[in-house]
Swiss-Prot record:
It comes from the Bacteria. GO terms for molecular function: deacetylase activity. This is Macro domain-containing protein RSc0334. Residues 1-171 form the Macro domain. Pfam families: Macro (PF01661). PANTHER family: GANGLIOSIDE INDUCED DIFFERENTIATION ASSOCIATED PROTEIN 2-RELATED, MACRO DOMAIN-CONTAINING PROTEIN. InterPro entries: Macro_dom (IPR002589), Macro_dom-like (IPR043472). Belongs to the MacroD-type family.
Length: 171
């Protein structure tokens, strides 16, 4: 079902530079920083983020937790833990959809109107990007009606092409 009032778009950018109400962090279960987008967000947000994440006591796969944005332009950081790809037979698709759904639910609770998502689980967690993009777009279209602007922030040109295709096919 289309969302008439929300803008969904993909762009290639550094998610830590986006001025929106919330950015989503593709975190690990400890929430203590790591590689990829998680490490970039922790470095850009400053040391207060690590302290705030310690107080959250981790996060389970598919769930989401929230902290202030600290030194980022975004007001909030929503941390979600994507599934590790194990061949697709261990509910990876459902867990990935849960990351988007639970991040959006948390955004709604905090009156977030604009949000940016990275490509969750497609880096070191190995989720095939060509499968992840349609799951992300479909889930956000189904559960993002309360927002004004939803951005899929892609690191690579290849990811951007996948998200643009998924967005066009969903229209």
């Amino acid at each position: 079902m289309p969302i008439p009032t929300v803008t969904l778009r993909a762009l290639r950018a550094d998610i830590t530079t986006l001025a929106c109400d919330a950015i989503v962090n593709a975190a690990n279960s400890a929430l203590l920083g790591g590689g990829g987008v998680d490490g970039a967000i922790h470095r850009a947000a400053g040391p207060e983020l690590l302290e705030a994440c310690r107080a959250l006591h981790g996060c389970r796969t598919g769930q989401a937790k929230i902290t202030p944005g600290f030194l980022l332009p975004a007001r909030y950081i929503i941390h979600t833990v994507g599934p590790i790809w194990r061949g697709g037979r261990q509910d990876e698709a459902a867990l990935l959809a849960a990351c988007y759904r639970n991040s959006l639910a948390l955004a709604k609770q905090h009156d977030v109107r604009t949000i940016a998502f990275p490509c969750i689980s497609t880096g070191v967690y190995g989720f095939p990007p060509q499968l992840a993009a349609p799951i992300a777009v479909r889930t956000v279209r189904e559960h993002g009606a309360d927002l004004d602007d939803i951005v899929f922030c892609c690191f690579s040109a290849a990811d951007l092409a996948l998200y643009e295709t998924a967005l066009n096919e969903a229209r």
